[in-house]
């Protein structure tokens, strides 16, 4: 049963260390190691700002973990109504060239699990923007609905063209 795989101890230790971040440097991701090692070598200790940032990262990690558990549990006892609370744990995949407008920052996030859109490879052109990702998601959804042998053309998240041929040969 899946419930046996829910971690209690590790998450509790992470939360306790994050709560005590004024006195504890908590690393929850190997990607954090180089910056902390550099700071320790340079200053002999981590700064309060670093510890606070790492604590925020830790609480984001535990919230994402809890959101995944909540999502799983909801599938085990579906209800007809909409939930009062719906936690969504998102994991950053990449920064995008810009947000919805060129003066805005943006990033692509995914939920826990696989998504074909996040594993795609850009074959040609610039780094994608937020709007480019919306176009890709719109095209993917339309082609998925039309089925094999279909194509979609999307501009600013609006379908400009779509075609389907049952036999592509």
Give the residues covered by each predicted segment.
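Active-site cavity-forming subdomains of large catalytic enzyme subunits
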Residues: 1-28
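Active-site loops and adjacent core secondary-structure elements that bind or stabilize anionic groups
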Residues: 31-169
């Amino acid at each position: 049963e899946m419930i046996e795989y829910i971690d209690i101890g590790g998450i509790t230790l992470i939360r306790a260390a994050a709560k005590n971040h004024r006195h504890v440097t908590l690393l929850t991701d190997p990607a954090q190691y180089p910056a902390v090692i550099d700071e320790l070598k340079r200053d002999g200790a981590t700064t309060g700002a670093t510890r606070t940032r790492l604590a925020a990262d830790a609480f984001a990690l535990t919230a994402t973990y809890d959101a995944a558990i909540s999502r799983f549990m909801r599938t085990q006892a579906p209800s007809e109504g909409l939930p009062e609370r719906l936690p969504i744990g998102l994991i950053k995949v990449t920064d995008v060239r810009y947000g919805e407008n060129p003066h805005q920052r943006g990033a692509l996030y995914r939920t826990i699990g696989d998504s074909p859109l996040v594993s795609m490879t850009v074959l040609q052109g610039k780094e994608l923007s937020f709007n480019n990702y919306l176009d890709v998601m719109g095209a993917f959804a339309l082609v998925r609905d039309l089925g094999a042998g279909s194509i979609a053309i999307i501009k600013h998240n609006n379908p400009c063209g779509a075609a389907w041929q049952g036999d592509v040969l």
